[in-house]
């Protein structure tokens, strides 16, 4: 039976897709539909070369998936015919899902219930699942949850110091995100260090427009920076990360902001965007560091916050840290940010290898610390699609 898996990642206004061989890891098709629901809705994909098409004003997830099936896959009938199953990235699974699951009506309801904590993402996931079922009625669908990897966190890590009944009755706790990426990096480090996954202790920094740090002990997540939602933790592209909660009351009561305005500010106007008041693009911050005040300010705050998290998470690993790892768009490509963060961790005996750090960009990987460094730091390209494909193939019986 074919182990080709169609991997779907439905964002609030995007659809990322790939056809992945779960056995070899080869990607036969990759693509992205973006600006969905807007006049400029479009799709880009790679299949025998690069292609791009306009989807039509207002095209949404259903139209994007239909275009992918009827136009892109139709041009490669053998690829479509050999699809074995469909895997869906699901941002939030609440406490119900501790691992990936074959999608049933009950699982679909669980995804809907968890939408309270991911109102932009989970409803889009459900649309993607329903559209996939309609277009491929004979294929099994599997949900792979970003939150599942973090379900091993101890109570001391996931509880907030709020009235306990808020957790027991309403599920208000830390859930964490990027679990699929953190899991992939854990497995990769195990291979690089020639250790069983169950013996790996790392701190992984997944840095992109959304960013999180995860402390991984004996191959399991024991703490992570994102919380109930993806808003908590690090400075991100447009998200604020950690702030004093009373700022919300001050904005509302003293400055007259509405709840909707505050929500929009914290999620879409903060982070690098807020600190620079120019852009959320980390490349601007990196390229103009030391020359433009706004870029310098943003990069210093970003690196300070990240270094604090990494240092703090050493306390969860009980004396052994095998490696600090960097992944994600920024983690894999920004040598200056990696160096600034690691230099702030000099107390741990970390020494950056400047040449190796510069080489580890644009697909380059490897150790970026010297042989004398007490703790190695590594750059590893993440591959969430492969994890989703592997889990899907296993649960679908491919």
Curated annotation (Swiss-Prot):
The cofactor required is:
Mg(2+); Mn(2+)
**What is the annotated signal peptide range for this record?**
none
What is this enzyme's class at the first EC digit? transferase
Q: Which GO terms describe its biological process?
A: acetate metabolic process; acetyl-CoA biosynthetic process
Q: Which GO terms describe its cellular component?
A: cytosol
Where it sits in the cell: the answer is:
Cytoplasm
UniProt cofactor note: Mg(2+). Can also accept Mn(2+).
GO-annotated molecular function: acetate kinase activity; ATP binding; magnesium ion binding
- At which positions is ATP bound? 16, 206-210, 281-283, 329-333
> Which residues bind substrate per the record?
89
Task: Write out the pathway annotation from the protein's UniProt entry.
Answer: Metabolic intermediate biosynthesis; acetyl-CoA biosynthesis; acetyl-CoA from acetate: step 1/2
Q: Where is this site: Transition state stabilizer?
A: 178, 239
Alphabetical list of Pfam families matching this protein: Acetate_kinase
Catalyzed reactions per annotation:
acetate + ATP = acetyl phosphate + ADP
Please state the protein's primary subcellular location.
cytoplasm
Superkingdom as given in the UniProt entry = Bacteria
- Tell me which residues bind Mg(2+): 9, 384
Query: How is this protein organized at the quaternary level?
Result: Homodimer.
What is the similarity comment for this entry? Belongs to the acetokinase family.
List, alphabetically, the NCBIfam families matched: ackA
Name-wise, this protein is: Acetate kinase 1
């Amino acid at each position: 039976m074919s182990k080709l898996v169609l991997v779907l990642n439905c964002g609030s206004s995007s659809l990322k897709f790939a056809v992945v061989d779960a056995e070899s890891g080869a990607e036969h098709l990759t693509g992205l539909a973006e600006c969905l629901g807007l006049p400029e809705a479009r799709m880009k994909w790679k299949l025998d070369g690069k292609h791009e098409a306009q989807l039509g004003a207002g095209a949404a997830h259903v139209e994007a998936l239909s275009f992918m099936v009827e136009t892109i896959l139709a041009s490669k009938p053998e690829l479509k015919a050999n699809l074995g199953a469909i895997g869906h990235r699901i941002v939030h699974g609440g406490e119900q899902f501790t691992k990936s699951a074959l999608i049933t009506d009950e699982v679909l309801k669980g995804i809907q219930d968890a939408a309270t904590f991911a109102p932009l993402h989970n409803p889009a996931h459900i649309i993607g699942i329903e559209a996939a079922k309609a277009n491929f009625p004979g294929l099994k669908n599997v949900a792979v949850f970003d939150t599942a990897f973090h379900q091993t966190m101890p109570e001391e890590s996931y509880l907030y110091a709020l009235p306990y009944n808020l957790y027991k009755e309403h599920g208000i706790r830390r859930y964490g995100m990027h679990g699929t990426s953190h899991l992939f990096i854990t497995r990769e480090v195990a291979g690089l260090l020639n250790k069983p996954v169950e013996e790996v202790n790392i701190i992984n920094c997944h840095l992109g427009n959304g960013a999180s740090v995860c402390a991984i002990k004996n191959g399991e997540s024991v703490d992570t920076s994102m919380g109930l939602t993806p808003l908590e933790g690090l400075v991100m592209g447009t998200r604020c990360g950690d702030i004093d909660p009373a700022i919300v009351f001050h904005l509302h009561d003293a400055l007259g902001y509405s709840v909707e305005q505050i929500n929009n500010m914290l999620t879409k106007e903060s982070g690098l965007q807020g600190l620079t008041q120019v852009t959320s693009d980390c490349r601007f911050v990196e390229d103009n560091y030391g020359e433009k005040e706004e870029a310098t300010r943003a990069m210093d705050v970003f690196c300070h916050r990240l270094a604090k998290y990494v240092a703090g998470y050493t306390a969860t690993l009980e004396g052994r840290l095998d490696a600090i790892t960097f992944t994600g768009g920024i983690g894999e490509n920004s040598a200056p940010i990696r160096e600034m963060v690691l230099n702030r961790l000099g107390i741990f005996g970390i020494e950056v290898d400047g040449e190796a750090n510069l080489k580890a960009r644009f697909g380059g990987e490897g150790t970026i610390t010297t042989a004398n460094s007490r703790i190695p730091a590594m750059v590893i390209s993440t591959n969430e699609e492969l994890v989703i494909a592997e889990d899907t193939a296993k649960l679908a019986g491919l």
